[in-house]
């Protein structure tokens, strides 16, 4: 379980793919111990299991289902990934509960830049639109955000400069 507040990012240094699975390696400045192999890390909103640790490099195995439902099928070396360690009992929750079980992706329809903030309008299928609530929470690339508007086949979120600075959303 995570809360969608991103303080760290990682950079993809290796991608090994075939039609049934992929493995990725991230370079990060999070400190990991070998004992953390098997622990969960939220990567772009997806709960992934750490399979290998070597210095500041961490590896993950991505199943066919994960590749189908997330944006990991299109990642490449050099891409920046939002990362968040799992919540610990008793710690502050600043965003909303993010399980890391991704249902689908959305397509950016429009980005409106207002001074240093952004409004992003996403297209989403009817199947998933019915799950959205205006002023409800949504996780985009693992970032806890509020849905500011829902229309026919779109929803809208607003992003403040602080969030753009700390996350990979600036790369959308």
Regions found by a protein language model. Give the residues of each.
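Conserved loop->alpha-helix
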Residues: 1-172
